[in-house]
Amino acid sequence: DEFNSTDLGLQWQWHANYNELWGMPTCNGCLRLYTADLEHPATATTDAVAYRSLWEAGNLLLQKLPARDFTATAKMRFASKEDNQYGGIIMMGMNYQALVVRRVGEKFLLQQLHCKDADQGGAETQKTLATFKPTAKDTIPYSPAVYLDIYMQMKVKDGYCRFAYSLDGKRYKDAGDVFALRQGKWIGAKMGFVSERSNTKGNRGWIDADWFRVSH
């Protein structure tokens, strides 16, 4: 998907009923996905919700796998307004694994997120793989964003997935552990984008995905 239309392609499916605050394709030729809250404080009518995994994250934008063996590559710019906002790509199912960049201070951490038995309340683990300096920074005084341009890739073969990344779109480096795909509930495994924040204060960040391409 080149995201050159303001209509989202029919191959894409949200992980829950759509909320317009999650994002949409833009007239600038990219898909914008805003970071969504992973934790929710208690209110007068609801209890606090603590984070365990992305199983309950409704704003995952996913599509079904196109073949047994394939490579999917995304070109994106991640913009962060606050610490602990992150975005990237994910292979989603009852077990899942994601490759994301997370803002910490004035740098970005490349991280592997992994969860086993997410549907049963399994807790997510995080592994830091690399550290990057921002590609660009806002100069505005109010709530400036820092940006990272990155290419992310997943290679699937015989039921296993290997993630990789590149900063120039030419030289890719393997990232994290090989992951065995597992189906979702009532559906097969799905792949796509993740954009979240664990700090619910301050302004949201976002992913601008230029394209998501699949090759066989």
List the predicted regions and their residue ranges.
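Extracellular glycan-recognition regions
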Residues: 1-216
